[in-house]
Swiss-Prot record:
Superkingdom of the source species: Bacteria
UniProt source species: Ruegeria pomeroyi (strain ATCC 700808 / DSM 15171 / DSS-3) (Silicibacter pomeroyi)
Its job: One of the primary rRNA binding proteins, it binds directly near the 3'-end of the 23S rRNA, where it nucleates assembly of the 50S subunit.
One example of a Gene Ontology biological process annotation: translation
Gene Ontology cellular-component terms listed: cytosolic large ribosomal subunit
NCBIfam families, per the entry: L3_bact
Identification of the protein by name: Large ribosomal subunit protein uL3
Modifications made to the protein after synthesis: Methylated by PrmB.
Gene expressing this chain: rplC
Self-association and partners: Part of the 50S ribosomal subunit. Forms a cluster with proteins L14 and L19.
Segment forming the signal sequence: none
The keyword rRNA-binding appears for this protein: yes
UniProt-listed InterPro entries: Ribosomal_uL3, Ribosomal_uL3_bac/org-type, Ribosomal_uL3_CS, Transl_B-barrel_sf
Length: 241
């Protein structure tokens, strides 16, 4: 079982395919995504990797977290997330994960915090049909109606669909397709919409309900030192570059 990634939702656009079709996609950016820590069976009782992404203002990082990053010799991160992995899929601390972690055409599960809508009625929140426009209905046209209980059991069951706070909840959209990856810019293009607002953080994992394609980077697609280091231009003859 491989690790997932942390990505920032940049926004939506469209891509034109070779056959002329246009596909709506969500652009996700891997912002300096690194392995911050490992969790091992011997020490923690389970195996996982802790990833970090983004660059925070140092004054917003607590003293405890600064010590955590310093102990691992990793730059402070704005967003942290932990992914359960198998023992053979542990990644070295400090390794930077590339956008090529996923393959084109692969199915993934994307999790994020949905956009908050505030207090919403039953028609908007649960797609209820509402009551009749007339014939005995007064000022209750958009109400949810009866909650379904009488003297026995004499209460409303937990989980009953009613008006309440809508959105701002953890949502996972499954089996979304990876249309394209751009390792140079650290971008992953996902077909369709993903949960959350622009600039929101999401996690992307291999789809649990689909078979993983062959050729997946294992344990992860890690940027090499040669890729990270910029190539210096050779100085011109007889002078500096």
């Amino acid at each position: 079982m491989r690790s997932g990634i942390i990505a920032k939702k940049v926004g939506m656009t469209r891509l034109f395919m070779e056959d002329g079709k246009q596909i709506p996609v969500t652009v996700l950016q891997l912002d300096n995504l690194q392995v911050v820590a490992q969790r091992t069976t011997e020490k923690d009782g389970y195996t996982a990797v802790q990833l970090g992404a983004g660059t925070p203002k140092i004054k917003r990082v607590s003293k405890a977290m600064r010590g955590h990053f310093a102990a691992q010799k990793v730059e402070p991160k704005r967003k942290l997330a932990e992914f359960r992995v198998s023992e053979d899929a542990l990644i070295e601390v400090g390794a930077e994960i590339s956008a090529e972690h996923f393959l084109t055409g692969q199915k993934v599960d994307v999790s994020g915090t949905s956009i908050g809508k505030g207090f919403a009625g039953a028609m908007k929140r649960h797609n209820f049909g509402g009551l009749r426009a007339s014939h005995g209905v007064s000022i209750s046209h958009r109400s949810h109606g009866s909650t379904g209980q009488c003297q026995d059991p004499g209460r409303v069951f937990k989980g009953k669909k009613m008006a309440g706070h809508m959105g701002a909840a953890r949502v996972t959209t499954q089996n979304l397709e990876v249309v394209k990856t751009d390792a140079e810019r650290g971008l992953v293009f996902i077909k369709g919409a993903v949960p959350g607002p622009k600039s929101g953080w999401v996690t992307v994992k291999d789809a649990v309900k689909k078979k993983a394609p062959e050729g997946l980077p294992f344990p992860a697609a890690v940027k090499s030192a040669a890729t990270e280091a910029p190539v210096a231009e050779a100085p011109a003859e007889g002078g500096e570059a």
